[in-house]
Regions:
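Glycine- and acidic-residue-biased ligand/ion/polar-headgroup-sensing regions
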Residues: 67-69, 77-94
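A short, N-terminal "cap"/entry segment at the start of jelly-roll beta-barrel domains
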Residues: 1-58, 143-146, 150-170
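Short, well-ordered beta-strand segments in beta-rich or mixed alpha/beta enzyme
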Residues: 63-66, 85-88, 104, 115, ...
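Short acidic-glycine-tyrosine-enriched beta hairpin
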Residues: 93-117
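A short hydrophobic beta-strand segment most commonly corresponding to one strand
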Residues: 106, 119-138
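Conserved short histidine dyad/triad with adjacent acidic residue
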Residues: 45-76, 96-98, 108-110
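Residues that flank catalytic or metal-binding motifs in active/ligand-binding sites
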Residues: 47, 81, 119
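Beta-hairpin (beta-strand-turn-beta-strand) motif
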Residues: 86-88, 95, 110, 118, ...
Length: 170
């Protein structure tokens, strides 16, 4: 056997062990259809479609729908955030850029901003860690984390006779 064959054989053996460990411990891949989660009111003119909750990493994925003239109050994130604009436009009042359909936004922890959409938008967000809503003096008025999002979703479902979709939980 050549050295190259030995390397390939070793690699295949390692991958086989990885596959066995994955099959033993990993969660199954999940699929959630577009109707699997309702639009849940968040603040006036703002709705959230919760997509997944991961308490292991204190993260959550959702689609944020801001109707025309809607605003998500002044806030900061304690972990990184990634967003992909599905439709419409929005901006942070504190910055000069405007995000439009097809744009990707990444946010570093600790930045303070106020999301606003003049004409409405839908954006997919992946949030890591808590989101803190602030008053004019930078005091934390409310902290929103993965457990808050879970409660937000479950409470809305219970109040509206909607079954809680267990596929959303990691």
């Amino acid at each position: 056997m050549t050295t190259s064959d030995e390397v390939i054989k070793g690699y295949v053996e390692i991958e086989s062990r990885v596959d066995k460990m994955r099959d033993k411990y990993a969660l199954q891949e999940g699929y959630i259809d577009g109707e699997g989660s309702p639009w849940v009111p968040f603040v006036p003119n703002v709705y959230i479609k919760h997509l997944t909750f991961d308490i292991r990493s204190s993260s959550a994925a959702n689609v944020l729908w801001v109707q025309a003239g809607g605003e998500l109050g002044r806030h900061r994130h304690r972990g990184p955030v990634s967003g992909y604009v599905i439709e419409g436009t929005w901006n942070y009042r504190e910055y000069s850029w405007v995000a439009k359909a097809g744009d990707f936004v990444r946010e570093s922890p600790g930045r303070t901003h106020t999301l606003y959409s003049e004409k409405g938008m839908k954006t997919f967000f992946w949030l890591n860690g808590p989101l803190e809503f602030l008053d004019a003096e930078d005091r934390v008025m409310e902290s929103v984390d993965v457990f808050w999002f879970i409660n937000h979703y479950e409470t809305y479902c219970q109040e509206n006779g909607i079954p809680v979709d267990q596929r959303l939980y990691l």
